[in-house]
């Protein structure tokens, strides 16, 4: 015994007392000291538990050797302790060896091994062992439920929980908290309320661990009234509880309620401040987020890398903001610029701010081998129309990931180089270990839409159907848009109807089919689809109304178009932009209501562009209005003096009116100024 004590002390793994801090919760479950164990057993079990907690494999192996030499491996408690040590340290080959040679396997042995498999994310092995267990307890079921939850198999976790309940196995607070977490990801409100009722029935609702998970569940399911009611009724709250409720308001966009709750937190931590900053950024309130950030610094809190990434990314989205430069200075001052992802974010910030030189300088000063920085530079070049430079960086990147390929393929698709986008896509699927994802396919279908090649579109669609890429609304919208732009509106409509009741929870697929139908002259179909949309809890957006107004324009439905235009702001809170005004000018102009079209242009919040004045000029010629034609031509020439199309159109207006002297003057002016002739204008759609 004295030699054993000296050995443990020499390895610094001797634990003098058997206090609870020496063991994790599972250890207390596995081992029972009722006074029958000898001091040697206690010492060994305690030391092995300490090794498991501290992940001290070297010391654990040495103790295992001493156990074998002493012949104590026949002792069930000690053997389970050795098994637990290897399982906790994720040395499953050693754990399996001990398990096979175990002389006295019991339910604790099986539970330890199942827990080891779950910790190492070997769920299949855990399931196989679970199925052959001679006796399953609450610990067995709880461990496997945790395994399902870790692998995002929420439905399976709930199913196993129901099996456990049907067998009459009593659950504990760990089981219930784990199941509540799984249920929160499934989003079923009735299951949520059932679990809360169960917690009350088992008198576990007062446990902070359980009640906090219940609160988190309601927040994830966006049942914030239930969440707040539970929060107010909780007998005990900790900072985690406050932060969960705060995060629920923040994620739901309820900033005022979040602010009110935030002010009530007496001891805020970095999570509390970060939640408020994140909530403001989600609402595009950068200035408010920076106020919280500044106040946080005054309270002595240090920002995290993730927080700085979020703030700088938001600054990049805020056009004309100088906040990003100040944040960059703070990042350098605090030494955050050595973090790889912050370096990539800084590159992205300058690229989006159209300062590609500074982005390139930041890249040169960063760790060039870091893939995120290279991807940021590729995307930056693409954003600034420098596709060749982007390709150069792409070709020099040896460890390309999915973001590298997506940035480059998207760059070609956006820069009107669809053939190059498709060529790179074929290279990706034939020679790269990186496989396309949904974002890749969106860019591919966009490129095919530009080409108008139905054959290419069908090939890409076939590839998608045989792949493992999960569908989403944006991908569905891209497919619908591709078929519509390639002239196969029936196929686009079939795909829309096949998917709208299965996965469509956003506006994207609706926009694709409405705009596609309108573009190809199916105005009634587009407007009928919009009517169907209004009966659903899906909100239209700016793009939706471009399609709707285009449909009205094609069908000559002036009054209906005006009604929809006015409803944008009054009914949906959408401010019309230049595309919507362009649709209305085109609609009014084609109907011969040129004065109204002119007044519409005057009311625009932004200056009319070449397209809008061109449409008014074209409509003026169609309806023989020389005065408005002269106005449109003058405005058009002021925007683009080198564009000869307006002069040609104006001379044709004069010719139609028989004003041949004016025709001669316009033609002479064109020859004098060497203005290029442009023969045509096209409408918005």
From Swiss-Prot:
MF terms in GO: RNA binding
Entries under InterPro entries matching the protein: E_motif, Pentatricopeptide_rpt, PPR_At4g14850-like_plant, TPR-like_helical_dom_sf
Start and end residues of each stretch annotated as Type E motif: 612-685
Gene Ontology biological-process entries: mitochondrial mRNA modification
Keyword Transit peptide: yes
Keyword Zinc assigned: no
Keywords carried by this UniProt record: Mitochondrion, Repeat, Transit peptide
Chief location of this protein within or outside the cell: mitochondrion
Transit peptide: 1-23
GO cellular component terms listed in the entry, alphabetical order: mitochondrion
Family: Belongs to the PPR family. PCMP-E subfamily.
Protein name, as recorded: Pentatricopeptide repeat-containing protein At5g19020, mitochondrial
Organism: Arabidopsis thaliana
Gene: PCMP-E42
């Amino acid at each position: 015994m004295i030699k054993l004590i000296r050995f443990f002390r020499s390895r610094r793994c001797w634990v003098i007392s058997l206090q609870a801090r020496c063991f994790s919760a599972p250890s207390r479950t596995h081992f029972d000291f009722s006074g029958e164990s000898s001091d040697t057993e206690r010492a060994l079990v305690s030391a092995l538990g300490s090794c498991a907690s501290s992940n001290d494999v070297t010391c654990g192996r040495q103790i295992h050797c001493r156990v074998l030499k002493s012949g104590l491996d026949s002792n069930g408690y000690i053997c389970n302790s050795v098994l637990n040590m290897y399982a906790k340290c994720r040395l499953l080959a050693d754990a399996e060896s001990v398990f096979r040679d175990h002389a006295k396997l019991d339910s604790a042995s099986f539970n330890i091994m199942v827990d080891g498999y779950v910790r190492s994310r070997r769920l299949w092995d855990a399931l196989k062992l679970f199925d052959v267990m001679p006796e399953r307890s609450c610990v067995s079921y709880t461990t496997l439920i945790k395994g399902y939850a870790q692998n995002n198999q929420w439905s399976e976790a709930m199913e196993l929980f129901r099996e456990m309940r049907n067998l009459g196995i009593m659950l504990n607070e760990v089981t219930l908290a784990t199941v509540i977490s799984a249920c929160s990801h499934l989003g079923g409100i009735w299951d949520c309320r059932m679990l809360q009722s169960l917690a009350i029935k088992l008198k576990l609702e007062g446990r902070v661990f359980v009640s906090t998970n219940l609160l988190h569940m309601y927040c994830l399911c966006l049942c914030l009234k239930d969440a707040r009611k539970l929060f107010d009724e909780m007998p005990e709250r900790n900072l985690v509880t406050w932060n969960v409720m705060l995060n629920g308001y923040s994620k739901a966009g309820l900033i005022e309620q979040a602010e009110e709750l935030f002010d009530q937190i007496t001891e805020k931590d970095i999570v509390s401040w970060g939640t408020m900053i994140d909530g403001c950024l989600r609402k595009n309130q950068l200035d408010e987020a920076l106020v919280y950030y500044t106040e946080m610094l005054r309270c002595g809190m240090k920002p995290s890398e993730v927080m700085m990434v979020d703030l700088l990314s938001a600054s990049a989205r805020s056009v004309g903001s100088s906040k990003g430069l100040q944040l960059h200075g703070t990042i350098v001052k605090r030494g955050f610029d050595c973090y790889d992802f912050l370096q990539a974010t800084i590159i992205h910030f300058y690229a989006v701010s159209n300062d590609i030189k500074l982005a390139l300088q930041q890249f040169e000063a960063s760790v060039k081998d870091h893939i995120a920085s290279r991807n940021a530079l590729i995307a930056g070049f693409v954003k600034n129309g420098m596709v060749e430079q982007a390709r150069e960086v792409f070709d020099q990147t040896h460890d390309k990931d999915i973001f590298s390929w997506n940035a480059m393929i998207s760059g070609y698709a956006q820069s009107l180089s669809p053939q190059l986008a498709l060529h790179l896509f074929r290279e990706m699927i034939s020679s790269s270990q990186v496989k396309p994802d949904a974002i890749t396919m969106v860019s591919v279908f966009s490129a095919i839409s530009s080409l108008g090649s139905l054959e290419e579109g069908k090939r890409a669609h076939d590839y998608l159907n045989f792949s493992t890429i999960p569908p989403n609304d944006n991908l569905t919208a891209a497919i619908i848009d591709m078929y519509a732009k390639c002239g196969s509106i029936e196929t686009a409509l079939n795909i829309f109807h096949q998917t709208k009741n299965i996965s469509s929870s956003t506006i994207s697929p609706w926009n694709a089919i409405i705009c596609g139908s309108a573009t190809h002259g199916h105005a009634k179909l587009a407007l009928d689809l919009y009517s169907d949309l209004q009966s659903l809890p899906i909100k239209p957006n700016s793009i939706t109304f471009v399609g709707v107004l285009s449909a009205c324009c094609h069908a000559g439905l002036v009054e209906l178009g005006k009604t929809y235009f006015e409803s944008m702001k009054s009914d949906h809170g959408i401010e019309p932009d230049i595309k919507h005004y362009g649709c209305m000018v085109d609609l009014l102009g084609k109907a011969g209501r040129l004065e109204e079209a002119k007044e519409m242009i005057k009311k625009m919040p932004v200056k009319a562009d070449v397209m809008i004045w061109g449409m008014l000029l074209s409509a003026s010629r169609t309806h023989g209005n020389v005065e408005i034609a002269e106005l449109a031509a003058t405005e058009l020439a002021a925007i683009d003096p080198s564009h000869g199309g307006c002069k040609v159109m104006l001379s044709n207006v004069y010719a139609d009116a028989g004003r041949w002297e004016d025709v001669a003057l316009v033609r002479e002016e064109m020859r004098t100024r060497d203005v290029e002739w442009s023969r045509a204008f096209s409408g918005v759609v």
